[in-house]
Amino acid sequence: MEPATAPRPDMAPELTPEEEQATKQFLEEINKWTVQYNVSPLSWNVAVKFLMARKFDVLRAVELFHCYRETRRKEGIVKLKPHEEPLRSEILSGKFTILNVRDPTGASIALFTARLHHPHKSAQHVVLQALFYLLDRAVDSFETQRNGLVFIYDMCGSNYANFELDLGKKVLNLLKGAFPARLKKVLIVGAPIWFRVPYSIISLLLKDKVRERIQILKTSEVTQHLPRECLPENLGGYVKIDLATWNFQFLPQVNGHPDPFDEIILSSLPPALDWDSVHVPGPHAMTIQELVDYVNTRQKRGIYEEYEDIRRENPVGTFHCSMSPGNLEKNRYGDVPCLDQTRVKLTKRSGHTQTDYINASFMDGYKQKNAYIGTQGPLENTYRDFWLMVWEQKVLVIVMTTRFEEGGRRKCGQYWPLEKDSRIRFGFLTVTNLGVENMNHYKKTTLEIHNTEERQKRQVTHFQFLSWPDYGVPSSAASLIDFLRVVRNQQSMAVGNLGARSKGQCPEPPIVVHCSAGIGRTGTFCSLDICLAQLEELGTLNVFQTVSRMRTQRAFSIQTPEQYYFCYKAILEFAEREGMVPSGHSLLAMDGQ
């Protein structure tokens, strides 16, 4: 089925021949995607909106389309019902509105009144829904599409209780790269002294071009940037606004016409199964040749800077359970907690004083929910918890990427029997060593777990990777790539022995992966596994996206820029070995930088 290109409607905005041609190209590209996901083709007018925002640069407009779609999906901005609560009250709060005047260039003027925002009263996702809804009403106008948007952030009369750093970051990210509007400038008016610190944090996330458009002004300075005819009275202008009633005009007669993006957002991922993964192909995936060119362009310093962009992002979620006084002794490192939202919960048992806490997180793999459990190297006081987790999660494979000691420091406890036929008892679980195989770069141990309460036995394969240096990263990824393949094969074979599971009737049990803290080498191993799986299936991958999404599940995954750079290096090394690029060609990008 070939993608259909939407015809130019009679009421479409007037475009130049070049702009019309760009619109046709954009629709051809996007509608390949809509056909793939079996959704309605994008309309001509919607296409023009995205192209206007990027001055009819087709590639940049396609990127914007996917950023907009992904942002709406991520923030739950779908099937909006402005006449229903809580969205109706948020729209009518007046904290955000579109003025009924334009600046001298014809740009629309959006106004956010900070003193009306009370984070403890308004759910952040509802605030974002209202913001999207009202901005969409503004850019329905061809004049706004053509002439852009001025955003005023009015902080007059506000205090710290009205400010929400995470919301501010999301709004700026939206305006700079995820909404179809030309952002002309952002005027921050009447900012208190305390605002300098959070603004310095936010500004680090912005490109220079966007940062140049942001100006922090005193109230008396606003008229130097916009005439009084364009400003509300409280900012020295002539525009009368009753914030309590002004936004009534933006409510539709009924809940409005269906939003074409609802279908696109809801259908852009596979059906919502219980085991959907965050690691699915995204819009910015690179081919292997594009990756080579990208690394050559960015060089080592640029890749390190890319990691810093990831590192600066605040963790998504909370750490209440990890930081609970009763659980602190179960954390190997005080600064490596695990997220409440993805933590593995142990079953509490009668007669035992244990909590359900272990420093371990469920992590998705490529197109597989909970493919891994990322965890710290077990402590003596958590051995029993570790094996209980392995039993309860029906784990078949354990991957250890550290030694017991490195650089004279203890990295992990000896939580399994090392010698053949030896056994260790952990409560009602007894672990027996059935045999050890010593390879060049790793050790493979077959273990049997006997649950004396349930009178059941299971086999688990334990791999210990031995070729990671005490400091830094391996000079070559060859041994790790080989090791990864061995682990994959063992998991596939073990799952196949389970019968029904191998036919996809229920999700595979996770692979337990740990190092010492459970974030550095663990994150590197899992990132490489995900990227190579996508590369082998589709011929594309995105390291930045993979690591960013991974950190939403196992916070702080990949600890250093060196480990992040190693992921790129390992992928290129793999591609060269597999003949995806000419021998020696890809690694030229990695040398001497």
From Swiss-Prot:
Keywords: Acetylation, Cytoplasm, Hydrolase, Protein phosphatase. One of its GO terms (biological process) is positive regulation of protein localization to plasma membrane. Residues 84-243 form the CRAL-TRIO domain. It catalyses: O-phospho-L-tyrosyl-[protein] + H2O = L-tyrosyl-[protein] + phosphate. Residues 303-574 form the Tyrosine-protein phosphatase domain. Gene3D superfamilies: CRAL-TRIO lipid binding domain (3.40.525.10), N-terminal domain of phosphatidylinositol transfer protein sec14p (1.10.8.20), Protein tyrosine phosphatase superfamily (3.90.190.10). The modification N-acetylmethionine is found at residue 1. The active site is at residue 515. The keyword Zinc does not apply. InterPro entries: CRAL-TRIO_dom, CRAL-TRIO_dom_sf, CRAL/TRIO_N_dom_sf, Prot-tyrosine_phosphatase-like, Protein-Tyr_Phosphatase, PTP_cat, Tyr_Pase_AS, Tyr_Pase_cat. It holds the Pfam family Y_phosphatase. PROSITE patterns: CRAL_TRIO, TYR_PHOSPHATASE_1, TYR_PHOSPHATASE_2, TYR_PHOSPHATASE_PTP. It is an enzyme of class 3 (hydrolase). Signal peptide: none annotated. Its EC number is 3.1.3.48. It is found in: Cytoplasm. The keyword Signal does not apply. One of its GO terms (cellular component) is cytoplasm. GO terms for molecular function: protein tyrosine phosphatase activity. Belongs to the protein-tyrosine phosphatase family. Non-receptor class 3 subfamily. Protein-tyrosine phosphatase that could participate in the transfer of hydrophobic ligands or in functions of the Golgi apparatus. This is Tyrosine-protein phosphatase non-receptor type 9. It comes from Mus musculus. The lineage of its organism: Eukaryota, Metazoa, Chordata, Craniata, Vertebrata.
